[in-house]
Amino acid sequence: YEMLRSLVGSEMCIRDRNNLDFVVDPVIPRSDEINSMKVFEDDFVVMHREDHDLSKVKNPSIDDILDQKHLHVSGRKRGLHLIDVELDKVGYRRKVALRCQHFLIAPRIIQSTDLVLMGTRSFAKRNDLPFVEIPIEIPLMEYFLIWHKNDEGDGGHIWMKDLIERAFKDAQR
């Protein structure tokens, strides 16, 4: 995440002439040139298809969950997901069997395979995916809206920031 912080921060500083208006990311760049606000927060669950073996286990353990084959969704070409970083901190690792780059396809993959997906509760509910709780403490998923401080007083920027913030609030319902 340090490298990403550096890249996003550098990118926004380079583009401080209204070329880049917003970034939404779980990482807040460390820079005096950047402002941010939290727009999304949700807990993680483990999604599966309707008749998956995991749905038959009452109160699945972390080992029950980690024994499954997992789908990893990330727009980044490589690297760990936030959930993997947190699992690694407590000595656990997922068995990632498939990686895809967008969440739009993830529900179809989960509904038609034995794979499971660690993702947010709101995503599971919005896509009508059955899920089980993760029986260990994992920090909440947080996303931040990030912008260059030079855009702070711009009326169009304020309007767009408000639209983005409301869209994320609607997504959590």
Spans of model-derived segments:
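Beta-alpha-beta core module
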Residues: 31-38, 42, 104-152
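Periplasmic-binding protein-like
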Residues: 166-173
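Single conserved hydrophobic/aromatic residue that forms the stacking wall/gate
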Residues: 1-9, 13-14
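Active-site-adjacent beta-strand anchor residues
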Residues: 47, 72-73, 99, 117, ...
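Hydrophobic hinge/microswitch elements
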Residues: 11, 15-20, 25-26, 76-130
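Flexible hinge/capping segments at coil-to-helix
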Residues: 32-70, 155-158
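Secondary-structure junction motif
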Residues: 54-55, 68-90, 153-161, 171
